[in-house]
Amino acid sequence: MAKKTKIILICAAALILAAAIVTTLCLVLVKPSEETPTDKTTISLNVNAYALTEDETFTIAATTNSTDVIKWTSSSPEVASVSSQGRVIAKTAGETTITATVGNVSDSCRVQVVADNAQATIKLAQTTLRLSAASGAMQIQGTVADGDSQQTLTEAGATYETDNASVATVSADGTVTPMSVGSTLVFVSANGRTKTVAVEVYTMLVSTAEDWNAMLGLPGDLAARFYVTNDIDFTDVVYNAKVNNGGDVLLSQSFCGSLDGGGHTISNVTFDGSVSSQSLFGTMVGCTLTNIAFSNIHFTASGAAGLAIRVLQHYNVADKNGNATRELLFAPCYVTNVFGDFVYDYNGVSGITGIYYGGGMENVFVNMRMSDGSALNKTTDFAVAKQSMVWSMADPNWFPNNYLNNVVVLAESGAVNAAWDTTYDGAGLTIGLSGLHCVTTKMEAGYLVRTLFDNNMWTVTPGQLPELR
């Protein structure tokens, strides 16, 4: 009996010890980490109402207990805009609300702008400067008029101030020097008036076919910014196609960042027949493509896709040696106000991408045609993509970023498939196709573009393909 008692006591002690360990572990698990917020985020502005005259500026001070960046917005930026540092710039008579937001809390200030009858005015030669490291610095030009007299900015003793010196600096004579990729404002003041110049600093300003090829040859960078300054004709120029379009998704091998076409057209590209998996950008991830037209883009291999072989919303984290790990990060693509005129030698093609992993497309027009005038085949040719692979197991927060809004695909000869040939992992369930319109005549295409697209960006001439303005 003594032995049994001993065993029972030992077991009881073990249970007590185990309970203590579990209790200790539970305490450790619920202990707040350094990242767990202990105080409620607050923000307050030093004024709740303010009045300005046209061309005046005023800086609102915000106080917050958060270390996050404060986001400033104006409800009516045409009346008064606000910089990233809270500086309000009055533009025209009216009323607006300036809001400062940090996290999920905000505070606001009502701003009234009244008309200024003073005769002094500042006229700027350019209200936006687009710069890159290669383009170098640029001087702000303009005049100051006061009654019947008119002076240059220098003659009027204009002063200059940058809103963010880490993006661009400005000297006493108004010379703006790019420092890093990003956006900022420069304030130009003279005779009691202030005007603003928007400064956009890019990774590269793309002006020629050679520039375009150089852009495609750069390692992918989510922070990259590109701007097209001219129409670019690839006649007699070999296109630098990206060919790493399968397997793991590495930023270094993908097209990333933002590309603003400035309403310009890339034309007359003919792919070398030796290039397989032909597309304009190869693999796109974390890419914003906007305001650009592609005309007479000739694909010479089967399986071609207009914009990209893969449009993705995730990529593999690379290790120190540049090799892919199994960790995935979220980086969706957004395609807006894009025109594509794509010519194919073979069937088995896609209008936009070979495989669509998600992302957003809006106000996109694609004209698909065969080079020999033969018909497109609804069984083998697809309006958007042959495959859809939007993962049902992905983070639910990813789903709202998947949409097709106002995508118009024209196939005058034959027809193209408006759905996916293959879906994986519940794909297609998170993407509605009601925003995709497949048509067979220019009249139908023109009607849809005129009624659905932004008329400030697009123009429609009866009997012709829609055009970006």
Q: Which role fits each region the language model picked out?
A:
Residues 2-16:
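N-terminal Sec-pathway targeting helices
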Residues 23-35:
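Hydrophobic single-pass membrane-insertion segments
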